[in-house]
C-alpha cells in the first residue's frame, strides 16, 4: 500500500509542480529573444525625428543623424 501512495503522490503532486515551473520560464525566454532582435542603430534613428535633437554620439556638424 505504501508503494501505491508514493506513486500517487509523485504523479499527482510532484509532476504537476515541475510542469508549472517550466511554464513560468517560457515568457522570460521569449522576452530575451525579442530583446536580442533589437538593433540599437535602428532604435536611435527611430527616436531622433520624434525628439528633434541632435544626437550626442557625434558632435561634428555634417553628421548623418543631425542632418
UniProtKB/Swiss-Prot annotation:
Tell me which UniProt keywords the record has, alphabetically. Cleavage on pair of basic residues, Disulfide bond, Neurotoxin, Secreted, Signal, Toxin
Judging by the UniProt lineage, the source's domain of life is Eukaryota
Could you cite one Gene Ontology molecular function of this protein?
ion channel inhibitor activity
Residue positions assigned to the propeptide: 25-51
Q: Does the keyword Ubl conjugation apply?
A: no
Q: Where is the signal peptide?
A: 1-24
Cysteines paired by S-S bonds: 54-65, 55-63, 58-66
Query: Which cellular component appears as one GO term in the record?
Result: extracellular region
What Pfam family is a match for this entry? Conotoxin
Name where it's found.
Secreted
Cite the record's tissue specificity text.
Expressed by the venom duct.
Q: What is known of its domains?
A: The cysteine framework is III (CC-C-C-CC). Classified in the M-1 branch, since 1 residue stands between the fourth and the fifth cysteine residues.
> Which protein family is it in?
Belongs to the conotoxin M superfamily.
Q: What protein am I looking at? A: Conotoxin ArMLKM-01
Q: What is the organism field in this record? A: Conus arenatus (Sand-dusted cone)
What are the leading ranks of the lineage?
Eukaryota, Metazoa, Spiralia, Lophotrochozoa, Mollusca
